[in-house]
């Protein structure tokens, strides 16, 4: 898996298990959608997005299997990654060009 860092989970939101992600990733529309898999934390735990919405400057995500705030709390402070091969966009992203001559 060629992983790309996309942001950090900075907090929970509400009691239903929603997580608040801060990200400056350019192609958010390509990843923040239902059934897309994000990889969270040092162990890169795969979590499937159930729902997504914007709230202020945050990306609010609800994951499958995260049913309440107690399930969500362990993810607070963790980094979020994607598999580059799962990103379906035309052209290149900045991360593709790093290290090229």
Enumerate the language-model features and the residues they cover.
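Short Lys/Arg-rich amphipathic alpha-helical segments
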Residues: 1-101
